[in-house]
Amino acid sequence: MSVITRFAPSPTGFLHIGSARTALFNWLYAKHTGGKMLLRIEDTDRERSTETALKAIIDGLHWMGLSYDGDPISQFERAERHRQVAKQLVKDGKAYYCYASPEELAEMRENARAEGRPPRYDGRWRDRDISEAPKGVKPVIRIKAPQDGETVLHDRVQGDVRFPNKDLDDFIILRSDGSPTYMHAVVVDDHDMGVTHIIRGDDHLTNAARQTIIFNALGWDIPVMAHIPLIHGENGAKLSKRHGALGVDAYRIMGYLPAALRNYLVRLGWSHGDDELMSIESMIFWFDIDDINKSAARFDLKKLDAINGHYIRMNNDQDLFDAVLNILPEIEGGLEIIERLDEQRRAQFLAAIPNLKERSKTLRELIDNASFIFTKRPLLLDEKAQILLDKNGQAILNGLYLALKACLSWDAKTLDETLRVYAQKQDLKFGDVAQPLRAALTGRVTSPGVFDVLVLLGRDEALNRITDQLVTTAC
């Protein structure tokens, strides 16, 4: 049997980080088994479904490198097929028309509330003849659910999960306006698409029990089910925006790499020994749904940062630069940076990446660490840099300016010798000389090596930046 999985998002918002992990697990299992992953858009909620959300989902999948087989399938466009199956169930005696009025249903709910039990439809139209139907009332179609015993879900992650049938009631599969319910449409679509394995969040467990009833009523094979644990925040509570519940696109703009996000997400609920970092080829080779944990995974942003930092360090410099250029239009101040990145500064930025990426956990940090390249003159000094350029620092800087200006060659070796000779003559430690210089060149106390910065900026720009600070202080 060829494995067919499916990712079935609703186009009502962005590709949530939890949905991205579900897509990843489906994709990995399909690749691991040599099967396919299909994309179904569950767009039956016409009021909330938008083209913008659909585009965000597809773009998010593409950015993460999660390809799907064939064209996306619209659930809404299959509504006629859903209606046909529902009506066939009525003909087969597996479902029935229900004419209960809104008032009757409200009374059932009120009685259940008064008796302290969950609201359940009482089945009053289950065995009544259609000739008793009131005039002018459009019926719904309800499934004839088993009234005794239990429905058992054989789940590859959760094990056997049992649901008393008395708690499931005769739920609606077709509304009075002829539109299918989610519960019914999913079953028909999974069957028609040939889905063999359903991998989704464990918040769908009760849905799975009801869908099992529909599968059985239709005499269709039930796909293998694997309900994966949800992702919780670091505090163990439901994932919130504060603790990482953002869309994939938000993580892209925050400067995370798709390979890093894949690597992090695959470890949320699944593992392979002590392996933290793994290639996509290793993930595909190792991944199996039987190894998914039952307990909820906790989202740890610091761990994601650490993994992303690893991928940044391992990445090709040009690819990192291209990724930076890709997100610049979407970050605060990014358009200004683009305007300042002329050909020379682009070359300087690219040349600085080997050093900068060693200290950057995200692309945003990489941009920030490179800001000394494209910042406006005179540089605004941060608080620590201002302290370094006090009167004593200014005196050191003034002497350094003269020493550097006299350099016949502007290379790291010559500059190193110049600074060390100057420090020795002034009876200063090398750090006492390098720190004020770094502050004047970058506006900060941390940066790539001071010689790297001097060479990167070039003689004229470096000397001009030193002059800026001397003039600024003198004023």
UniProtKB/Swiss-Prot annotation:
Q: Which reaction does it catalyse?
A: tRNA(Glu) + L-glutamate + ATP = L-glutamyl-tRNA(Glu) + AMP + diphosphate
Primary localization class, coarse: cytoplasm
Task: Tell me the compartments it is located in.
Answer: Cytoplasm
Question: Which positions does the motif 'HIGH' region occupy?
Answer: 9-19
Q: What residues bind ATP, as annotated? A: 241
For this chain, the family text in UniProt reads:
Belongs to the class-I aminoacyl-tRNA synthetase family. Glutamate--tRNA ligase type 1 subfamily.
Enzyme class of the recorded protein, top EC level: ligase
Q: Which domain of life is it from?
A: Bacteria
Q: Which GO terms describe its molecular function?
A: ATP binding; glutamate-tRNA ligase activity; tRNA binding; zinc ion binding
Q: What is this protein called?
A: Glutamate--tRNA ligase 2
Q: How does it assemble?
A: Monomer.
Any one GO CC term of this protein is: cytosol
A GO BP entry: glutamyl-tRNA aminoacylation
Q: What does this protein do?
A: Catalyzes the attachment of glutamate to tRNA(Glu) in a two-step reaction: glutamate is first activated by ATP to form Glu-AMP and then transferred to the acceptor end of tRNA(Glu).
Quote the CDD domains the UniProt record gives. GluRS_core (cd00808)
Q: May I ask which residue range the UniProt record assigns to the signal sequence?
A: none
Recall the taxonomic lineage recorded for the source organism.
Bacteria, Pseudomonadati, Pseudomonadota, Alphaproteobacteria, Hyphomicrobiales
A matching Pfam family = tRNA-synt_1c
Query: Does Nucleus show up as a keyword for this record?
Result: no
In chain numbering, where does the motif 'KMSKS' region fall? 238-242
Keyword list (alphabetical) reads:
Aminoacyl-tRNA synthetase, ATP-binding, Cytoplasm, Ligase, Nucleotide-binding, Protein biosynthesis
